[in-house]
């Protein structure tokens, strides 16, 4: 009976203990939202990591629960990059969690070895980091540049010998980037390559060993107490190699080789990092004897794979997003011709400050950080409040670089997309803000030491590849990623061909100038654009609109395009064309029309919408606003045919200069009925306006407030003249520009210094292959200088192959693109931009033929 009592008491005690333990776990962070299981166990974290898609699970959790989410009984994940300084301060006090304990390489005879990146003890970390930190400064790294140059030469030799002339047989470009990164680090560290490039394979199984290490520690890091049983256990080590053992064997081999002559008092002339490590240890009694081993291990583990990761990210995205590839190649060619950039051995001095290369590197670091689980820290005494959430002392807290780097409040709604331009044209403060929001290299006291080495290698490699080879990606759908702490990519297959060398100076005069960066704010929102051709035709006198005159081009019969812009159930019209009863316009306007032009087939846009027999179903009653590009008769249509609830939007100065209208003002060119009973909104491009921004050289206004549709200040042709820019696709972005009457012939815009005459059109005699055929005539513009500036601004837009430019009276587009009720959102996929850009040369050919 006594035994039964003891058993019962013991059972009750165990139950009470477990209940208290579970309650403490739950209550410890009870105010932090998260999935139910996370309050009691870390097993779901293990599953997330084991799946290889932990970053996706993390993102879903934050989407559901907010910026602070409980991932485990004592672990909280934060997604807001604005909290980086609080969690990763420059001062001591936020040690790394036991997640990093599992990353210490282990051997049975020497135990677990701390290194700079995995040490939890902050005093030990300081003792390991401080002696070698100067070696990783850019000043010192540049002294080792010749080691990288040697490896670049071997890479070129191997690519030329193995893959050129191979009948476009695909090869694993991703693996060769990794071979280059490892052999570069080998030369930097040991003055010798591992042999990856020469052999074209994983030497000594190092790559496989590192990936095995990552897959093991990523899981163990979620339940670090289990590591002592499964990995750092002398008994287990009898049956399998512990994590990091293979890499340590390579490290020990090279160190022993380097120490041998030193033990014989032989002088070594090696200038690599291992020599510097050994010199530091030999000259500083406070440095632990095993420190060079730890430093070298870090170089191999963290310094090579992560660099290769960024290289793969850059090349994949450049090859998929060919517009960014072209832009970077243009920048490199410009630097080659003007600054002496070498194709085979570019110096750091020549590549360090190339703006678009820099933007591509930053975008790769942002989009695909090499390490992709939360960087865990332990909250010190006194606790921490982040995201309005209090975390008591002892709580494990961390931010994943994947979450911080894709924060949409910081990087824009297109934070998931490749867009290097987001880094260009920023103020110093905005650029710093974005850079400080990146967690790729860590932050605070534990920022990655090898950052400068990685940047130097990357900025030297990418120009070499792009200047020497035409590279095409093969089956991009096979490109995959797997997250095992290290965010690995596979499947980057490509074919290469030798790129023809442009002789320096031979084509500079014909070489296009890079247009200014447009700095269109990122957005994931788009509009549908439908171009309405009402069938109305106007006869234009060229001398009123452009100069010089061509004897055979005395008259141009032009259409009048209008635009239906839709986002969801919201619909606006940009311009209305010529009203059907145009003879009811003010007498002075009617007289001008009859003396200078003829109008064929005028139609009201409201009638076109209301008679549409397609399934579109957008009627005049659905239009929330009419936007006038300007107040001339061939654009204003008849607003009175729309409900009074339809707003009229006009450019700056229109309201005061055009109303009262006719008949109140006999000299007016607009009618009172245009606005009678209707709300008129006159937009302003003043920077004090909330939605006012700058796009390229244009002052702009975000019309819907979501980055899908902008009005641009296209001044000069008349008072209040505006254009519009619509985002019609994302991933990648493409746009439609509606130019109104900024000019009336594409020859006013093309060729340009950004867009020279194509070779197939050079049989037409031109004064210059990089200057427009025509210039604006000064006859009609209300402000000729402003009109010329607007044309220059449009030329900048026109130079981008993701902007489709439509002038209101461009006859070359008729029959060469889709019109209402179809959208033109797929204009780029259908090739409208390339197919129509130079069709205006037909006018010139016809004009010259007519003079013969």
Curated annotation (Swiss-Prot):
Cofactor(s) listed: heme
EC code(s) of this entry: 1.-.-.-
Pathway(s) annotated for this protein in UniProt: Secondary metabolite biosynthesis; terpenoid biosynthesis
Catalytic function, reaction form: 5-methylorsellinate + reduced [NADPH--hemoprotein reductase] + O2 = 4,6-dihydroxy-2-(hydroxymethyl)-3-methylbenzoate + oxidized [NADPH--hemoprotein reductase] + H2O + H(+); 4,6-dihydroxy-2-(hydroxymethyl)-3-methylbenzoate + H(+) = 5,7-dihydroxy-4-methylphthalide + H2O
Membrane-spanning parts: 7-29
Binding site for heme: 448
Record topology, Lumenal segments: 1-6
Free-text disruption phenotype from the record: Results in dramatic reduction in MPA production and leads to the accumulation of 5-MOA.
SUPFAM superfamilies for the chain: Cytochrome P450, Metallo-hydrolase/oxidoreductase
InterPro entries: Cyt_P450 (IPR001128), Cyt_P450_CS (IPR017972), Cyt_P450_E_grp-IV (IPR002403), Cyt_P450_sf (IPR036396), Cytochrome_P450_monoxygenase (IPR050121), Metallo-B-lactamas (IPR001279), RibonucZ/Hydroxyglut_hydro (IPR036866)
Membrane topology of this protein: Single-pass membrane protein
Family: Belongs to the cytochrome P450 family.
PANTHER family reported for this sequence: CYTOCHROME P450, CYTOCHROME P450 MONOOXYGENASE PKFB
Role played: Cytochrome P450 monooxygenase; part of the gene cluster that mediates the biosynthesis of mycophenolic acid (MPA), the first isolated antibiotic natural product in the world obtained from a culture of Penicillium brevicompactum in 1893. MpaDE is an endoplasmic reticulum-bound enzyme that catalyzes the conversion of 5-methylorsellinic acid (5MOA) into the phthalide compound 5,7-dihydroxy-4,6-dimethylphthalide (DHMP).
Name the UniProt record assigns to this protein: Cytochrome P450 monooxygenase mpaDE
């Amino acid at each position: 009976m006594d035994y039964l009592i003891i058993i019962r008491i013991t059972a009750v005690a165990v139950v009470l203990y477990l209940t208290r333990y579970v309650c403490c776990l739950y209550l410890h962070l009870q105010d932090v939202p998260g999935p139910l299981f996370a309050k009691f166990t870390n097993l779901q974290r293990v599953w997330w990591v084991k799946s290889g898609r932990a970053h996706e699970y993390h993102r879903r959790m934050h989407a559901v629960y907010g910026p602070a989410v409980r991932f485990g009984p004592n672990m909280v994940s934060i997604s807001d990059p604005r909290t980086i300084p609080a969690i990763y301060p420059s001062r001591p006090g936020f040690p790394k969690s036991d997640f990093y304990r599992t990353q210490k390489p282990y051997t049975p005879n020497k135990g677990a070895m701390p290194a700079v990146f995995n040490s939890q003890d902050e005093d030990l970390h300081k003792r390991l980091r401080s002696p070698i930190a100067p070696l990783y400064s850019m000043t010192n790294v540049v002294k080792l540049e010749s080691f990288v140059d040697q490896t670049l030469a071997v890479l070129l030799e191997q690519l030329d010998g193995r893959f050129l002339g191979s009948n476009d047989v695909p090869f694993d470009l991703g693996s060769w980037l990794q071979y280059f990164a490892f052999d570069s680090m080998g030369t930097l560290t040991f003055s010798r390559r591992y042999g990856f490039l020469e052999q074209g394979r994983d030497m000594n199984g190092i790559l496989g060993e590192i990936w095995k290490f990552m897959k093991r520690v990523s899981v163990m890091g979620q339940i670090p107490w289990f590591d002592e049983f499964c990995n750092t256990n002398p008994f287990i080590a009898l049956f399998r190699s512990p994590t990091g053992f293979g890499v340590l064997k390579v490290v020990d081999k090279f160190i022993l080789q380097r120490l041998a002559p030193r033990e014989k008092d032989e002088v070594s002339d090696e200038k690599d990092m291992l020599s510097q490590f050994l010199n530091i240890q030999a000259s500083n009694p406070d440095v632990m004897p095993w420190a060079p081993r730890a430093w070298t291990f870090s170089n191999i583990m963290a310094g090579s794979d992560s660099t290769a990761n960024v290289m793969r990210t850059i090349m994949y995205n450049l090859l998929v997003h060919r517009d960014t590839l072209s832009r970077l190649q243009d920048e490199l060619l410009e630097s080659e011709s003007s600054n002496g950039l070498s194709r085979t051995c570019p110096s750091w001095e020549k590549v360090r400050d190339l703006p678009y290369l820099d933007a591509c590197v930053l975008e790769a670091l942002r989009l695909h950080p090499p390490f992709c689980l939360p960087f865990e820290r332990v909250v010190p005494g006194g606790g921490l409040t982040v995201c309005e959430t209090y975390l008591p002392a002892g709580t494990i807290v961390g931010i994943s670089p994947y979450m911080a780097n894709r924060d949409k409040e910081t990087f824009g709604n297109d934070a998931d997309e490749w867009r290097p331009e987001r880094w260009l044209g920023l103020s110093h403060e905005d650029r710093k803000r974005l850079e400080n929001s990146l967690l790729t290299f860590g932050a605070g006291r534990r920022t990655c030491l090898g950052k400068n080495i990685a940047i130097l290698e990357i900025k030297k490699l990418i120009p070499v590849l792009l200047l020497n080879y035409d590279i095409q990606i093969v089956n991009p759908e096979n490109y995959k990623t797997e997250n095992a702490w290290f965010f690995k990519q596979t499947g980057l297959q490509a074919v290469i061909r030798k790129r023809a060398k442009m002789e320096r100076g031979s084509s500079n005069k014909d070489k296009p100038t890079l247009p200014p960066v447009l700095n269109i704010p990122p957005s994931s929102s788009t509009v549908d654009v439908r171009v309405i051709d009402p069938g109305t035709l106007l006869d234009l006198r060229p001398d009123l609109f452009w100069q010089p005159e061509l004897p055979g081009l005395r008259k141009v019969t032009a259409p009048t395009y209008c635009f239906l812009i839709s986002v969801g159930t919201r619909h606006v019209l940009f311009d209305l064309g010529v009203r059907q009863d145009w003879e009811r316009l003010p007498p002075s306007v009617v007289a001008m029309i009859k003396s200078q032009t003829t109008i064929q087939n005028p139609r009201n846009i409201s009638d076109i919408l209301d008679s549409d027999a397609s399934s579109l179903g957008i009627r005049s009653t659905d239009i929330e606003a009419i936007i006038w590009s300007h107040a001339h008769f061939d654009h204003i249509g008849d607003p009175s045919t729309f409900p009074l609830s339809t707003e009229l939007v006009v450019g700056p100065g229109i309201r005061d200069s055009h109303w009262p209208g006719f008949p109140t003002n006999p000299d007016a060119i607009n009618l009172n009925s245009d606005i009678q009973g209707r709300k008129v909104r006159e937009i302003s491009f003043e920077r004090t306006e909330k939605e006012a921004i700058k796009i390229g050289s244009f002052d702009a206004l975000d019309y819907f407030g979501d980055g899908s549709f902008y009005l641009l200040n296209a001044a000069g042709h008349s008072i209040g003249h505006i254009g519009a820019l619509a985002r019609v696709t994302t991933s990648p972005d493409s746009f439609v520009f509606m130019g109104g009457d900024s000019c009336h012939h594409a020859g006013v815009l093309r060729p340009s210094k950004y867009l020279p005459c194509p070779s197939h059109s050079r049989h037409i005699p031109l004064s210059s292959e990089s200057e427009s055929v025509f210039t604006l005539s000064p006859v009609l513009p209300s402000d000729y200088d402003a009109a010329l500036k607007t044309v220059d601004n449009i030329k900048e837009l026109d130079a981008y192959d993701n902007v489709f430019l439509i002038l209101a009276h461009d006859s070359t587009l008729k029959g060469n693109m889709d019109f209402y009720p179809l959208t033109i959102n797929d204009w780029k996929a259908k090739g409208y931009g390339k197919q129509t850009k130079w069709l205006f040369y037909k006018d010139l050919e016809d004009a010259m033929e007519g003079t013969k």
